[in-house]
Amino acid sequence: MHNILDPTFNGMPGSELYRAEVFPELFPHQPPMRLENWSQEDLELYVGGCFTPGYGERKSA
């Protein structure tokens, strides 16, 4: 069974992001996993709701 510190994950995209959550002092350059750090495009695509332009402006038929 593998874990996030296993060498198998070295160099994989995003592996340092998860490692930084466990050992932030070893990966100080990685931002915390928070919505404030997401691009507007990613927020619209993966979160939706209030992050999507025009949300809440629906008109009744």
From Swiss-Prot:
InterPro entries, sorted = Gp52 (IPR035344)
Top-rank taxon of the source lineage equals: Viruses
Tell me which Pfam families the record gives: GP52
Identification of the protein by name:
Gene 52 protein
What is the species listed in this Swiss-Prot or TrEMBL entry?
A: Mycobacterium phage L5
